A protein has these predicted regions:
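A short acidic, amphipathic alpha-helical/loop segment
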Residues: 22, 97-105, 129
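Walker B catalytic acidic pair
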Residues: 89-91, 118
Length: 140
């Protein structure tokens, strides 16, 4: 069974760099990955941007009222090649229902999902997406 993973850390701790490294590792083995992030994250527009200067375009953006599952299925269908992993940057900005859909992608579609983000804001209040990921993720 595929799992939902939540990789969290403080700002500037290398989460986006880790995501880009994970994508590279999958692709080096000839496996297809999809990258996504919330549309509300305006840093880099359609790119995942690491503080080391590495960038990569996402396969899809997800608005707060959009279905992650539908966006994933649409992007996955663009090529006749199975998706080995879905990588999500800035997952703290996703909504509860969208995190529930990430779990469905892992469990029902058999595609591992690795979500990267921060747990709390500067006032130590949990972000909606992070709180739900802490409840549902198979691995932290």
């Amino acid at each position: 069974m595929a799992k939902l993973y939540f990789r969290y850390g403080a700002m500037n701790s290398g989460k986006s760099t880790g995501l880009l490294q994970a994508a590279f590792n999958y692709e080096e083995r000839g496996q297809r990955v999809l990258l996504a992030k919330p549309a509300t994250d305006t840093k880099g527009e359609r790119d995942v941007v690491s503080r080391l200067g590495m960038t990569r375009s996402v396969d899809f953006l997800v608005g707060p009222d959009e279905s992650v599952l539908e966006a994933f299925e649409h992007a996955a269908a663009e090529r006749d090649e199975p998706v080995a992993c879905l990588l999500i940057d800035e997952a703290q900005f996703l909504q509860r229902a969208q995190i529930d859909e990430l779990l469905r992608i892992a469990v029902e579609r058999g595609v591992p999902v690795i979500a990267y983000g921060i747990r709390t804001d500067f006032l130590t209040h949990a972000f909606t997406g992070s709180a739900r990921l802490l409840e549902l993720a198979h691995s932290l």
